[in-house]
Amino acid sequence: MKVRSSVKPICEHCKVVKRQGVTRIICKRNPKHKQRQG
């Protein structure tokens, strides 16, 4: 999980999800792409 100020989808499989006001990126194909805004 990368914590970044600016989160962007890295590949076409990345999904943007908002949970409790926190923007996250989840990726089934490549879990290395997981990110959270912080």
UniProtKB/Swiss-Prot annotation:
Q: Which UniProt keywords apply?
A: Ribonucleoprotein, Ribosomal protein
Per its UniProt entry, which superkingdom is the organism in?
A: Bacteria
Q: Does the keyword Metal-binding apply?
A: no
Q: Name one GO cellular component term.
A: ribosome
Q: Does the keyword Protein transport apply?
A: no
Pfam (any one): Ribosomal_L36
Q: Which GO terms describe its biological process?
A: translation
Q: Which SUPFAM superfamilies match?
A: Ribosomal protein L36
User: What Gene Ontology molecular function terms does this protein carry?
Assistant: structural constituent of ribosome
The family assignment reads:
Belongs to the bacterial ribosomal protein bL36 family.
**HAMAP family membership:** Ribosomal_bL36
How is this protein named in the record? Large ribosomal subunit protein bL36
